[in-house]
Each structure stands twice: as C-alpha cells, then as structure tokens.
C-alpha cells in the first residue's frame, strides 16, 4: 500500500470506494459534492487530499484536510477506507500523512466533525480518540499537533 497525493486519474475509483464504504456502514450511499472536484475544493484552496492505493493500483482509502481561514487549525475531511480493507492500518496511515502535512504547513490543531446520528459514526467515534483526539463540543473532536 502506498499513500499518494490525489490524482484525477483515480477520481472514479475513489468515488466508487467511498460509496461502497458508506453502504457497508448501513448508510444510504451518496457522494460528497467536494469529492467531485478535489482540485477545486482542496488543492486550489491550498489544502490537501490523499489516496491510499493497493498493489493492484486501486483506491482503498482517502482523506484530506482544509485549513480554517486565518487560523493555525484545520479540519480532517473524508477519511474513508474500503470496507474489505479495514483494520489493516490504512486509516491510521492516512491520518498520519494528513497530520504530517498539516504540521509542515504550520497547522497546530487538527479537528474533525462527526456526523449525526452518532450511532452511524460509531467507527469515527472510536477511531479518532485512539489517535489522540478528544471531544471539545458535541460532534467535534480535536488534537494538538
């Protein structure tokens, strides 16, 4: 597995993976509009987005971040791992890469917004605290980098 900066050539495979990941969690599969144009919604704004690619050149995970304007804080966005690839360290590797890039850009606080109802976000509610995040208000967690 390798983690790379988003490339348009993987766009459709990423979208397919995200829809599968949502379906596996029992959510109605729908695509987040920002993922339809990662370049405009992340790179053109000075933010970042990564893909996890397997040995068959398929997308098995993704995630990115967007800086909160005029602060040293950023939000982690769209951290997904293909359902059949979970519990193999892919999400942790993506988060580590995201946080490393944040630090390089002078970001000191990483935040994440959890969806609702909370029961549908049980994996996120367990994942982020294992990586040093703590809830600071309902549905939000943060970590000092």
Name each model-derived stretch.
Residues 130, 134, 139-145:
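Terminal substrate-recognition subdomain of acyl/acetyltransferases
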């Amino acid at each position: 597995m390798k983690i790379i900066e988003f490339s348009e050539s993987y766009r459709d495979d990423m979208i397919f993976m995200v829809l599968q990941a949502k379906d596996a969690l029992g959510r109605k599969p729908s695509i987040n509009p920002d993922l339809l144009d990662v370049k405009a919604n992340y790179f053109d704004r000075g933010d970042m987005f990564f893909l996890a690619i397997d040995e068959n050149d398929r997308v098995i995970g993704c995630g990115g971040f967007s800086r909160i304007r005029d602060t040293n804080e950023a939000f982690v966005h769209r951290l997904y791992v293909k359902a059949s690839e979970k519990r193999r360290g892919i999400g942790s590797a993506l988060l580590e890469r995201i946080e490393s890039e944040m630090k390089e850009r002078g970001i000191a606080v990483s935040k994440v917004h959890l969806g609702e109802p909370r029961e549908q976000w049980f994996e996120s509610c367990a994942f982020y605290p294992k990586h040093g995040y703590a809830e600071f208000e309902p549905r939000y967690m943060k970590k000092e980098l």
